[in-house]
Amino acid sequence: IWGIGCNPCVGDEVTALITRGEA
């Protein structure tokens, strides 16, 4: 799982959570 407009990278799950929280 990766954040919107973000390439799959280490900690993609954390990025997704942050993105959803801020989105």
Swiss-Prot record:
Processed by the macrocyclase-peptidase enzyme POPB to yield a toxic cyclic decapeptide. POPB first removes 10 residues from the N-terminus. Conformational trapping of the remaining peptide forces the enzyme to release this intermediate rather than proceed to macrocyclization. The enzyme rebinds the remaining peptide in a different conformation and catalyzes macrocyclization of the N-terminal 8 residues. Residues 9-23 form a propeptide. There is a cross-link at residues 1-8 (Cyclopeptide (Ile-Pro)). The modification (3R,4R)-4,5-dihydroxyisoleucine is found at residue 1. Keywords: Hydroxylation, Thioether bond, Toxin. The keyword Thylakoid does not apply. There is a cross-link at residues 2-6 (2'-cysteinyl-6'-hydroxytryptophan sulfoxide (Trp-Cys)). The modification 4-hydroxyproline is found at residue 8. The typical symptoms of amatoxin poisoning are gastro-intestinal distress beginning 6-12 hours after ingestion, a remission phase lasting 12-24 hours, and progressive loss of liver function culminating in death within 3-5 days. One of the few effective treatments is liver transplantation. Major toxin belonging to the bicyclic octapeptides amatoxins that acts by binding non-competitively to RNA polymerase II and greatly slowing the elongation of transcripts from target promoters. This is Alpha-amanitin proprotein. The lineage of its organism: Eukaryota, Fungi, Dikarya, Basidiomycota, Agaricomycotina.
